Amino acid sequence: MAALTVIGTSRHNPQALFPTGSCRHILSTTRGGGEPVAAEATSWQKEQVSRAYVHALSTQGGYTLCDWNVDKDGVDVTLRSGPWMVDIQLKCTQSPRIVRGGFSFDLDVETYDKLRNPDRSAPGHLALLIVPPDIGQWVTHQSESIILACHGYWASLHGLGGASGSVTTAIHLPEHQQLTVKAMGTMFDAARRMTNPAGRGVN
């Protein structure tokens, strides 16, 4: 049975280094003679690989995950652990903008205002998933594993101030805030504090 392995790309070089030998790329684009060429991903492909990444992490962490058909509230997925929930807006890029201490992403102001709203029932977060420039290197298949070349970073937007721009606002995603199972636990800790500010009923 094949196992799923999630690996990351280098922060300074988004082009991932992949296993060689018997490894076979599942997703690939070829010229007429069969020679592989780099392929730019469409928006729906980026969206789906982002969801796959979060699904894998939430499953390992034992969290329930809900996909929303429409993100009119600025939310793509909601995680749940018992009575607590975490809302996440997912973004994916093949060419991340690197800044000091992490990454920067221009989020539309409408979504930003929804996620930062202090009256939300669940804290809002932005997650930025980074994939290799060549879609043919996103997924590779070995005899014992399927490797997903994707890694992510996150930022909590709950309760932040007004946007710096009128159309988009730059969101800083710290390098140390990688999107992992442990990070999801941190998000739920914040959700508990938000719903129980005095610590009532929290173990």
Residue map of PLM features:
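Mixed-charge (Asp/Glu-Lys/Arg
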Residues: 1-73, 78-203
